[in-house]
């Protein structure tokens, strides 16, 4: 499987042969859904909280005597059925994270890469280095390349000037290759990999 390599100026820089076991799979939506759900659940704050009967500021005195009034039997007015009472089975602070096997996560990443390749939404670029960190100049380059909504994966480290110029652009994400993940790949229209990122991914899944 071969991809043409482009440059930030829109020129050609040869081609690269990639492993079909990484970029040529038949995408499985179930794997992608499981991985995205795992990522979003892990980042969910889980800080929602309501007060239980033991926490609200209300007297615990019995409302009226047990017998003789003709009314239903009640204890304290902090019970959930009364106005101002506690919430029954309300949310408490907890972690929403759940486990997903490492092999499934790795397979989902390969399927996400394959999905972009199959949709012709994967671009390999020679390098992402800039002499200055000017956002306007980079925006013009992206406009010429058609990268209005893209995830750009650099090498082990992202060029400082490139990262500074790209961070002010909406719908453009820049990550080092170690940070590549299924959710960020799928939420952008285009995936841009540097030559160094392709080599790192090939080595990772060897």
Swiss-Prot record:
GO CC annotation: ribonucleoprotein complex; ribosome
Gene Ontology molecular function terms on file: rRNA binding; structural constituent of ribosome
GO biological process annotation, one example: translation
Region span, Disordered: 49-79
UniProt keyword list: Ribonucleoprotein, Ribosomal protein, RNA-binding, rRNA-binding
Subunit structure: Part of the 50S ribosomal subunit.
Cited function: One of the primary rRNA binding proteins, this protein initially binds near the 5'-end of the 23S rRNA. It is important during the early stages of 50S assembly. It makes multiple contacts with different domains of the 23S rRNA in the assembled 50S subunit and ribosome.
Homology family: Belongs to the universal ribosomal protein uL4 family.
Name listed for the protein in its UniProt record: Large ribosomal subunit protein uL4
Protein species of origin: Methylobacterium sp. (strain 4-46)
Species lineage: Bacteria, Pseudomonadati, Pseudomonadota, Alphaproteobacteria, Hyphomicrobiales
Gene from which this protein is expressed: rplD
